[in-house]
């Protein structure tokens, strides 16, 4: 048998995509042109179709080499989104977030819509008053402001061959102040009471205002720094606000077709993770070096603070979206308000949702009422709740009777809100969509069952091998809770004798073992009284069994007359060292 040679190039896909981006910038080998307000953008048809469901439907069955977008799409905004399709990086000003997010939703670019919109409201948290605030994974190490501004970052941002990071990062880029003039930073500071024009004033240690006002920092996705941060002498030039208009309704479909992006299978895996209940958390600067943050610092006067105060922007629906859907949304969305404000979805229903979450649903849905229903359901119900539910309670004869319907109070409020948004939306269609989401959630969870089985403790596999073929033939419950509960449950049905001693027989292929009440008093206390089939559960716990339960295996071993008998699960589970699997009978 000949040997097989395996060659693997790390980050090969990112390198190829970077080369395609270079070709696009040079105008080489491009097979399609996107015309926006008379300005043509050359690109590769395959890259656009892979990044945008809108372009995939547009290119389907159409061999034209030029396509024109609605005249209300701003060219500068489309240029940024086109660059994102090749690099996975998006940089925009804080005041342009809503327009960019809505344009990305119109083009059906899910990565921007689902990740960018969730981070949009985190950027301007009311307690985010540090010079640099980062949203990273929990395993990342604290970084000092000096380390974040290394020259290598500029090369990383400009080189197309650098692999795209897997985690989304958001940075606030602001002008660095001298370390000698910075006092200890307070953990909480009041909001800036200055004019709401997007300008924050930096003050020195002595209380003298800065020579020039600083613009609000630009938002950088995937850790791309702004040029003004790397080179402080260069000032940022804001984009013309007149061009930042949202796309019109000339190309928006008014009905959900079979190719709608929320009817695709690939959307089902992430539709339930886009909403986070507490997504407006506090972000503080990570103090390093000589700047230690006190637990209860003394209040510092506003005049002596040497950092930039970033206010929390108030949000409202864009005027371009209102012109398409009218005034069918929640009445509070048409006026500016705090994104963390709790709104009652329907008056008198008692079902509440934050302003930011509800606006996120409308920005993603646009004029599509079915997409709005899916987004609202994904906001109120997580994936596990949907997977363990039968939908609206209308179940078929083959459904598992243990599945309970979704909360009727929340479900009725969502239905009523969607009917107010689209009066022609039938309740039967809503029930089908809710049931379909539950089915998709179960299908996604079943994909992870082999991985969960591979992570089971060794005690479970040992126990099944000792119990023999009868116990091994019992499959794991496909609906058992996953890693969130940390409880692994295997049901074994035992027989119960009718005598007063209540002896449980554990039958295996090799031998029958009888545990009497005198030999195992702890087991008698835990034994269920009702029913003919008792259930024995295995619980994964780091601690050992209590002292009174450890005496039972010793008594059992003393009563053993044959050395050829296999060791019972009770004795094996008890002898395991601390920190491993412990079976509880």
From Swiss-Prot:
SUPFAM superfamilies: POZ domain. Residues 348-445 form the BEN domain. Residues 30-94 form the BTB domain. InterPro entries: BEN_domain, BTB/POZ_dom, SKP1/BTB/POZ_sf, ZnFinger_BTB_dom_contain. Keywords: Isopeptide bond, Nucleus, Ubl conjugation. There is a cross-link at residues 171, 215, 296, 426, 453 (Glycyl lysine isopeptide (Lys-Gly) (interchain with G-Cter in SUMO2)). Residues 238-261, 549-571 have a biased composition (Polar residues). It comes from the Eukaryota. Residues 238-269, 541-585 are annotated as: Disordered. It is found in: Nucleus. One of its GO terms (biological process) is positive regulation of intrinsic apoptotic signaling pathway in response to DNA damage. The keyword Heme does not apply. Homooligomer; mediated by the BTB domain. Interacts with the NuRD complex. Interacts (via C-terminal part) with HDAC2. Interacts (via BTB domain) with MTA1, MTA2 and MTA3. Functions as a transcriptional repressor through its association with the NuRD complex. Recruits the NuRD complex to the promoter of MDM2, leading to the repression of MDM2 transcription and subsequent stability of p53/TP53. This is Nucleus accumbens-associated protein 2. It comes from Rattus norvegicus (Rat).
């Amino acid at each position: 048998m000949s040997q097989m040679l395996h060659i693997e190039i790390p980050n090969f896909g990112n390198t190829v995509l970077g080369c395609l981006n270079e070709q696009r910038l040079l105008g080489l080998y491009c097979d399609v042109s996107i015309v926006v307000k008379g300005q043509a953008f050359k690109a590769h048809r395959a890259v656009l179709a892979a990044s945008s469901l809108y372009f995939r439907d547009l290119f389907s069955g159409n061999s034209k080499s030029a396509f024109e977008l609605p005249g209300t799409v701003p060219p500068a905004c489309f240029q940024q989104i086109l660059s994102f399709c090749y690099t996975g990086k998006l940089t925009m000003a804080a005041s342009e977030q809503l327009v960019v997010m809505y344009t990305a939703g119109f083009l059906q670019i899910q990565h921007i819509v689902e990740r960018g919109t969730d981070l949009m409201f985190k950027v301007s948290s009311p307690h985010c008053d540090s010079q640099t605030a980062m949203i990273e994974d929990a395993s990342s190490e604290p970084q000092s402001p000096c380390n974040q501004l290394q020259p290598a970052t500029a090369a990383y941002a400009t080189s197309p061959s650098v692999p795209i990071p897997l985690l989304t990062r958001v940075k606030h880029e602001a002008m660095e102040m001298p370390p000698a003039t910075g006092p200890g930073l307070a953990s909480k500071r009041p909001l800036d009471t200055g004019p709401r024009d997007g300008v924050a004033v930096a003050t020195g240690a002595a209380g003298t205002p800065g020579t020039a006002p600083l613009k609000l920092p630009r938002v950088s996705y995937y850790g791309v720094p702004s040029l003004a941060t790397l080179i402080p002498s260069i000032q940022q030039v804001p984009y013309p606000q007149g061009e930042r208009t949202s796309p019109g309704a000339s190309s928006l479909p008014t009905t959900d077709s079979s190719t709608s992006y929320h009817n695709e299978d690939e959307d089902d895996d992430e539709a339930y993770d886009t909403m986070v209940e507490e997504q407006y958390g506090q972000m503080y600067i990570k103090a390093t070096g000589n700047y230690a943050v006190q637990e209860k610092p003394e209040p510092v006067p506003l005049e002596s603070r040497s950092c930039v105060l970033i206010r929390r922007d108030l949000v409202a629906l864009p005027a371009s979206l209102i012109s398409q859907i009218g005034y069918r949304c929640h009445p509070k969305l048409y006026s500016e308000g705090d994104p963390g404000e709790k709104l009652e979805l329907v008056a008198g229903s008692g079902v509440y949702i934050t302003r930011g979450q509800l606006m996120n649903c409308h920005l993603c849905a646009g004029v599509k009422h079915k997409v709005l229903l899916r987004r609202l359901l994904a906001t109120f119900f997580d994936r596990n709740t949907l997977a363990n539910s039968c939908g609206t309670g209308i179940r078929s004869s083959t459904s598992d009777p243990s599945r309970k319907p979704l909360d009727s109070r929340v479900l009725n409020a969502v239905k009523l809100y969607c009917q107010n948004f689209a009066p022609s939306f039938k309740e039967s269609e809503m029930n089908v969509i809710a049931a379909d989401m539950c089915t998709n959630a179960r299908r996604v969870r079943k994909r992870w069952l082999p991985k969960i089985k591979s992570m089971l403790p060794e005690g479970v596999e040992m126990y099944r091998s000792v119990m023999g073929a009868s116990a091994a033939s019992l499959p794991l419950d496909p609906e058992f809770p996953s890693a969130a509960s940390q409880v692994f449950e295997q049901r074994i049905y035992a027989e119960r004798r009718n005598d007063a001693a209540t002896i449980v027989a554990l039958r295996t292929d090799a031998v029958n073992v009888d545990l009497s009440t005198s030999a195992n008093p702890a087991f008698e206390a835990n034994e269920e009284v009702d029913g003919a089939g008792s259930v024995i559960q295995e619980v994964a716990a780091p601690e050992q069994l209590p002292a009174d339960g450890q005496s039972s295996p010793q008594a059992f071993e003393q009563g053993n007359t044959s050395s050829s008998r296999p060791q019972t699960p009770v004795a094996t589970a008890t002898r395991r060292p601390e920190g491993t699997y412990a079976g509880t009978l």
